[in-house]
């Protein structure tokens, strides 16, 4: 714990590195990742499977199990009270106290949060009592209010239910309510709406956005879906092979992407292609973390790659406020691309 600071971002991640030791070698799942998230800000962390986005979230939460380990970097959390915690220096017990209290996580599968043999009221009141000095009756009232906030009808009656008595969308709402219970400074959401239909997904996204704005809770939303980020987030970081390759405001990154990988993702979206025109695609496959090419990890799939791309590009700030890891920034817009 360090001195109080009132103007700092809620979260500062700097030079984060997470490795997994395997029989085939060492895979760096998170490689020199840096970003900040302000109070009440929603940041999208985007990338395809294996990009390192979920591992970044688990690293912040202190949930990396062997053979994985965080080997470098700084993770600082500054609460509403202005006190800064260096999460990497905390003991296992101290991190346990932080989770569910100052930081919370919403998982893709709500049953990773919910115990199938306990009623919802039992699980929610225990989550409050573990971190706050209140009576059981007060904790239960807080649970009821949290269910109401996430749009669950008849919250008093639903407290009496078991998880299997809820639909998938309602279970995810309960998981979100549990994450919000203790008014955390930071929530990390790992693709929590992926398995839900579009209508339910839209409702939950709107509710989460409103709740974060009202409470001042910072949110990292991990997803592979650019359309979700477009409607939810303020800023976005795009990850590829364990590294952030581009970050900036949602409008900047989605409308005028500068990294060839971001450009390829957006240009290949069906909504940008007229009917009857073949979809664009990014050639090749995502490289194995055990056999990354030298220099830029994207260079073997990139149409703009030259000899200089065999060197490792740094994540550098641009004049427009975004950051980019590329020697050859794209200048055209995605809608100008041809198949």
What is each residue range found by the language model?
Residues 76, 138-157, 266-267:
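Conserved ABC ATPase "signature" region
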Residues 69, 81-104, 122, 130, ...:
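ABC ATPase NBD coupling module
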Residues 7-9, 84, 153-157, 247-339:
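Short catalytic/signature loops enriched in Gly
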Residues 109, 116-129:
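Q-loop/switch helix immediately C-terminal to the Walker
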């Amino acid at each position: 714990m360090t001195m109080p600071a009132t103007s700092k971002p809620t979260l500062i991640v700097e030079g984060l590195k997470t490795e997994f030791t395997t029989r085939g070698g060492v895979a760096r799942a998170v490689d020199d990742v840096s970003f900040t998230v302000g109070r009440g800000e929603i940041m999208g962390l985007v990338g395809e499977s294996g990009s390192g986005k979920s591992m970044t979230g688990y690293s912040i939460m202190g949930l990396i199990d062997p053979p994985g380990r965080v080997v470098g970097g700084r993770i600082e959390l500054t609460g509403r009270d202005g006190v800064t915690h260096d999460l990497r220096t905390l003991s296992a017990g101290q991190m346990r106290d932080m989770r569910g209290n100052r930081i919370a996580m919403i998982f893709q599968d709500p049953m990773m949060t919910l115990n199938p043999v306990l009623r919802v009221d039992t699980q929610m009141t225990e989550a409050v009592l573990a971190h706050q000095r209140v009576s059981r009756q007060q904790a239960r009232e807080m649970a009821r209010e949290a269910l109401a906030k996430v749009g669950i009808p008849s919250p008093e009656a639903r407290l009496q239910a078991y998880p299997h008595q809820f639909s998938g969308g309602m279970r995810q709402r309960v998981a979100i309510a549990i994450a919000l219970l203790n008014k955390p400074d930071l929530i990390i959401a790992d693709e929590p709406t992926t398995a839900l239909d579009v209508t339910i997904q839209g409702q939950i996204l709107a509710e989460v956005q409103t709740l974060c704005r009202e409470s001042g809770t910072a949110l990292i939303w991990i997803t592979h879906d650019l359309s979700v980020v477009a409607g939810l987030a303020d800023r976005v970081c795009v990850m590829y092979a364990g590294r952030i390759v581009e970050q900036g405001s949602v409008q900047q990154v989605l409308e005028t992407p500068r990294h060839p990988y971001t450009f390829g993702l957006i240009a290949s979206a069906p909504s940008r292609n007229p009917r009857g025109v073949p979809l664009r695609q990014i050639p090749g496959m995502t490289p194995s973390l055990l056999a990354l090419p030298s220099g830029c990890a994207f260079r073997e799939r990139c149409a703009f790659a030259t000899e200089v791309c065999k060197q490792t590009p740094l994540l550098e700030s641009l004049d427009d406020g975004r950051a980019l890891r590329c020697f050859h920034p794209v200048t055209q817009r995605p809608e100008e691309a041809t198949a």
